[in-house]
Each structure stands twice: as structure tokens, then as C-alpha cells.
Amino acid sequence: MTRLVFCRKYQQEMEGLDFAPFPGAKGQEFFDNVSKQAWQEWLQHQTTLINEKRLNVFEPEAKKFLEEQREKFFNNDASVEKAEGWKPEA
């Protein structure tokens, strides 16, 4: 049976994640409030940001930047960073 959650990005009930994406309270929050579709879209966006901005994910500044961008992404904040020069496939 599919687990449904009220997705905070899409503001509707959608299929939930199969497991928390990371340990702790924040991981549980995403498990409870983010759809599988929204999480996959975030992973794609995060990968694009890492590649285009040449982020080293082991550096604290890069981790902080990605955490801030993740919150903006799931809150539909218009100030979420876009990778310059990147165009999604049509």
C-alpha cells in the first residue's frame, strides 16, 4: 500500500518517501511532509547546483548553502538559486 503525505512543496496529498532521507528530526520532517516526486526533483536540482557551482559537499559553507537552498526549494521560495546556463530538457 502506498503511503500518502501532504507534500509541503505541492500542497496536496501525494506518494510519500519510502524512508527518511537522512537521520534525525530533519530527516523525519522530510519523511512526513515531502512527496517522493518533490524529493526526486530536489535531488536533481541539488546535483545541478553542486556541478554548476563546483561545490565541495565536505566544506561547511557548501553544506550550509545546500541546506538553505533545500528549504527554499521545498517552500517554493522564488529566491532559490538556479544554475546559470543550465536549461532543463524539453
Swiss-Prot record:
Q: Which InterPro entries does this chain map to?
A: Fe_traffick_prot_YggX (IPR007457), Fe_traffick_prot_YggX_sf (IPR036766)
- Pfam family, any one: Iron_traffic
Picking any one GO molecular function of the record gives: iron ion binding
In the UniProt record, which is one GO cellular component term? cytosol
Keyword field contains Cytoplasm: no
List, in alphabetical order, the GO biological process terms annotated in this UniProt record: cellular response to oxidative stress
Instruction: Enumerate the UniProt keywords alphabetically.
Output: Iron
Its job = Could be a mediator in iron transactions between iron acquisition and iron-requiring processes, such as synthesis and/or repair of Fe-S clusters in biosynthetic enzymes.
Which family is annotated?
Belongs to the Fe(2+)-trafficking protein family.
Instruction: Kindly provide the name given to this protein in its UniProt entry.
Output: Probable Fe(2+)-trafficking protein
Name its species. Answer: Acinetobacter baylyi (strain ATCC 33305 / BD413 / ADP1)
